[in-house]
Regions:
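Active-site-adjacent structural elements in folded domains
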Residues: 110-113, 163-169, 221
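Functionally critical mobile loop/hinge segments
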Residues: 187-293
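Glycine- and small hydrophobic-enriched segments that form the cores of compact globular domains
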Residues: 88, 115-122, 134, 138, ...
């Protein structure tokens, strides 16, 4: 049976024809195209989840200072604030933001993370998965299933557009990570394949045009904050979709729109650290690049 797909439409068709969720279509695709046994494919994804889990929790036990210096300890501050019962966000969002920011601290200190789809956006998917797991007592196996769903969305983005900030801006990095997380969350919470991709499309609509402007050229700031924003965006999109709100624009078309917008961004706003936040006087002074002229 051919389980390969090159577009979201083809993916939905496979799901409908075989009465399978996105996660299972993606799993079978990996098995068939990679000529790899199911157990081996599952083992690799379980290992990815193990690394995600560790990177999302390690900085909460011992805050980590980044190599560049701009970030370190933010995740622990969020957790402490939450424990004081003074947070204004609900449990899922508070936890998701905390874990997402924690992963960026590990990445910025040269620790082990899973690029999902990139290092600079690596906190969004694990942040979402771990928050849902804790709040809804979800098993590791179901999380692994959801990660195959996220992988399907990431694969489509890499095949038909880009996940590189240098090509498409932050909308292509945190934006796609957020789309992956939203789709996975919808399946995890009982949504159907159409709802999953509706959520992914909503995410990209909400983040369309977001630039990539790392201060000092480091994948630290504003990247960490944007991972928190990305997982919040994913939760919003997932909730809208699960409530039955349909997305007007299909994921394939939204992906095309994101790619087109990204290619029109000037070079200064595509990971060169020459524009946006990176070009502000405060940012230049903070990274030692301010000449005073």
């Amino acid at each position: 049976m051919n389980m390969d797909f090159k577009s979201a439409k083809e993916l939905l068709d496979l799901c409908e024809e075989n009465q399978l969720p996105i996660s299972e279509v993606m799993r079978q695709r990996e098995c068939l195209l990679g000529e790899t046994p199911r157990d081996a494919v599952d083992h690799r994804m379980a290992k990815a989840w193990e690394i995600m889990h560790a990177s999302a929790t390690q900085p909460l036990k011992k805050p980590i200072k980044s190599m560049g210096g701009p970030i370190g300890g933010e995740a622990k501050k969020l957790e402490t604030h939450y424990n004081k019962k003074k947070n204004i966000c609900g449990d899922v969002l508070q936890k998701a933001m905390t874990y997402a920011m924690a992963v960026l601290e590990v990445n910025a200190s040269m620790g082990l993370i899973v690029a999902a789809p990139t290092a600079g956006s690596a906190g969004v998917v694990p942040g979402m998965m771990l928050a849902l797991q804790e709040c809804y007592r979800i098993s590791d196996q179901r999380i692994v299933d959801a990660l195959f769903n996220a992988g399907a969305v990431g694969y489509l983005a890499m095949r038909n557009a880009t996940v590189a900030g240098a090509v498409g801006g932050c909308q292509a990095e945190v934006g796609i990570a957020s789309a992956m997380a939203a789709s996975a969350a919808v399946e995890l919470m009982g949504g159907n394949p159409q709802q999953c991709l509706d959520a992914a499309s909503t995410v990209l609509m909400n983040m369309l045009g977001l630039v990539c402007d790392p201060v000092g050229g480091l994948v630290e700031y504003p990247c960490q904050n944007r991972n928190a924003a990305g997982v919040a965006n994913a939760l919003i999109a997932a909730e809208l979709s699960l409530s039955g709100i349909r997305q007007l624009i299909p994921f394939d078309q939204m992906l095309d729109a994101m790619y087109a917008v990204g290619k029109r961004l000037p070079a200064e706003l595509r990971e060169t650290a020459l524009g946006g936040c990176a070009a502000t006087p405060a940012a230049c002074a903070a990274c030692g690049l301010c000449s005073g002229n």
